[in-house]
Amino acid sequence: MDPLFNLVRLPTSFMDILSENALLLVYGLLSLYIVRKVQVYARLRHISGPFWAGFSDWPHRKAMLQSDCEAWYAGISEEHGPMARVAPNVVMTTSPDVWAHVTNKPGYKRSDWFFKAMRSEHRRDNVFTQTDVEKHDGRRKQLAPGVSGSGNPNMEMAVNECLEELVHLIRSKYMSSDAEMIPMDLARKLQYFLLDSISAVTLGEALGSLQGDGDTHGYIKSTEDGLVMGTTALALGFSWMCQVPLFGRLLTASPKDEAGFGRFMAACFASVDERLANPTDERSDALASFIRNGVTGDDARSEALIFMTVGAINPLAAMSGILLHVISNARVYALLQREIDDAARHGKAPSAGKGLITSAQAKQLPYLQATIREGMRFWPPVVGLFPRRVPRGGDTVVVDGKPVFLPGGVCVGRSVSAMYRRKDIYGNDADSFRPERWFEPDAGKLADMLLRNFGFALVNPIRPWKTRNTLGIFLTSDMWVHVTERL
């Protein structure tokens, strides 16, 4: 054979061998992938759920991207029961007993993939994102007095001042009459009220959103944009990149930013730094309580920031939901109005123009309290999955009287909306807004203040508002109403 021919054939033979090995490698990797998928599927095959949930988490990611997780969870729960698989390694429950077991039994840890994605700062945790159980519980004890009000005696007064600003804003700019109908976005006004209230409660001074009748510093928009970006990062699975040393700083907000959430951070941090630099400051607010209980330095900055962020957003869905269902339900509206009028008539609450009802007085109005509870059931402020990781070795939970084994490492989350609308717990009319199911006292007075002074009517009953779910928090907007003075 010609030697030249052998020299020419050698590279070709080498390429053939390389191609065959590459093909074997591809087949091997594909086989390992299939085996791994089958193993993951088999771990939770005893738990009902959509077939695809055992192999892919993309439907779950899609629901997060569409800000529609709660409706998606509810649909799965309706079909597969109170314990259902929603992703290869994630199960969702609507059982209060199972969720109480998961959150109270030692060994369960908050899932890093979810809670770390909710960090506001680069590689820094707060009480909301801390997954170390001991650190989380310790920080909660430090913050509790300032959050509950026991360490912040001026909390009610601070909220009342903002409530008076809200009433003044409505009366001075948005009062409709027979001659003119003036639409008002109630959800946005409530947002201004919340932002001013939480800043007054936390930092001792309202930000002035109600006085300016606007998002004067862009804080609301920047917070909402941050929540949307966080949801997108979590859904697409790249939120971990925000926590990478050095590089992650480029992807997260910073107090050095001139716009967006970083601007909100800078304002909050400046207030905290000013307080820390003046230890003799005798103001009584949540931040002062935090500092008195040992939360200082960067920790004080982080906790004040999350307290401001969550406090300005979380209650909005419940408050808007309560008012929406009262305004759109003539029977509930009339009963609540009658109770409030009777209380004012008998001296159990101040009459219109004679000041604000106190928290203690509001707790003595049973139908008001039932309405608030029903609103919280219908529109829970926080609806995220908030998963816990099953401890090593696994655990057994009881679902509707039957034991169900959960392998170690599996994530267990909850669907609050579906849980609060279970017909076996709340009755066959669980999807209806009916305060009579409660009649138990609870805190709250904003609905009382608004309903005692004004009459409301929805501008568009067919589409009364817009909502979207971001990181388990409902963002509510475009709740247009007409407000008239009560005669």
Regions found by a protein language model. Name each.
Residues E78, A84, R292-D298, G355-E374, ...:
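Cytochrome P450 C-terminal beta-domain/meander region
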Residues Y219-N293:
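Cytochrome P450 catalytic core segment centered on helix I
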Residues A330-A334, A443-I473:
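Cytochrome P450 heme-binding "Cys pocket" and the immediately downstream C-terminal segment
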